Amino acid sequence: NDYIPVIVPNDIDNESEYIDPRETALEIAEKMQADKLVYLSKYPGIYKDEERKDIYYKITVPEVEKLRKERNFPKEFDEIIGYGLQASKNGVNRVHILDGRIRHVLLIEFFSVNGAGTIFIETEAKLYLHELGK
């Protein structure tokens, strides 16, 4: 769509109504049928195991749903995963979860082979050629 909307938290302390930027970003991405939805968080991505040593760089929606049933993710992170799953099911091609504490994390994610966080997609058919090793 040639748009890059950026959604940020409320920045005025006297606002009486809280608007969740994660939920707002989800709704905008769904309405725009965005190619990508990016969440910056304090988590580096979805960990492969409970020891939190390695993260998935790419994972499918069914795999994320399975992990979500098997593990207890922190509440805030579980909400992000839930928004990402909803976006994926409602037409957003890719959801990226990135560690917002890393400098230049968006550049690293979009301009390197493995990226800097976890992306999840509906099916492996939506992977880019370089992600398939081709």
Question: How would you describe each model-predicted region?
Answer:
Residues 1-134:
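C-terminal catalytic "cap/lid" subdomain
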